[in-house]
Amino acid sequence: ANANYRDSDVRLTNPVRDARALAEELRRDGFEVVLKENLGKEDMQRTIDQFAATVPSGATVLFYFSGFGIQVNRQNYLIPIDARIWAERDAQQDGISVERTLGQIHAKGAKVLLLIIDASRKNPFERRFRSYSAGLSATAVPERTVAISSASLDKAHDDVDANPSMFMSELLKEMRAPRQSTAEQVFLRARNGV
């Protein structure tokens, strides 16, 4: 979760709180959790590399990111806190590719990958080179991957200070619901609840 962006006058409050709430819920359910906060590109990439290297074959993996994200040519990039973005090429250079990250995790033999990206915020970087925030595009996901974004595709939302955010509140509510559901059903109900 990234919130303290160095090259931005916008301070996010939800990403770290939401990541902690999700981590707590997953630990309560018996999952092993790796939680990292406010990482620059080098640390983000190293964390992803180390995480992917430890994925046991046949595991179910949940990858969550909250912070700023930018799409460039229908590819999504997670933005590290030390990114300096003034043009699309900067997002490609300084960002972390969602598609590459998915490929890394699947290459290690994850049976199922659950992807949650809460990065469709209107962000200060995009406004430097676009007249609007484009949100995130559809991610080409490998087989056995279920993906959800906090906003509809190609839409961006304002970061509203809530603890937890509306999206995370709905996701946690659906995860705790007593009914038997697939991850896809939980994700769909959470997003529809927002």
Language-model regions: role of each:
Residues 1-4, 151-153, 172-179:
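Cell-envelope and extracellular/periplasmic
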Residues 187-194:
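An often Trp-containing, charged/polar helix-loop segment at the C-terminal end
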Residues 39-66, 70-128, 163-167, 172-187:
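Caspase-like (clan CD) cysteine peptidase catalytic core
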Residues 26-36:
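Short beta-strand elements in bilobed, periplasmic/extracellular small-molecule ligand-binding domains
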Residues 1-10, 27, 82-85:
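Active-site histidine-acidic residue metal-binding/catalytic motifs
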Residues 5-20, 160-163:
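Glycine- and acidic-residue-enriched helix-capping/strand-helix junction motifs
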Residues 113-162, 169:
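Extracellular S/T/G-rich loop segment that most often corresponds to the catalytic His/Ser-adjacent loop
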Residues 10-15, 72-80, 136:
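Short beta-strand-loop
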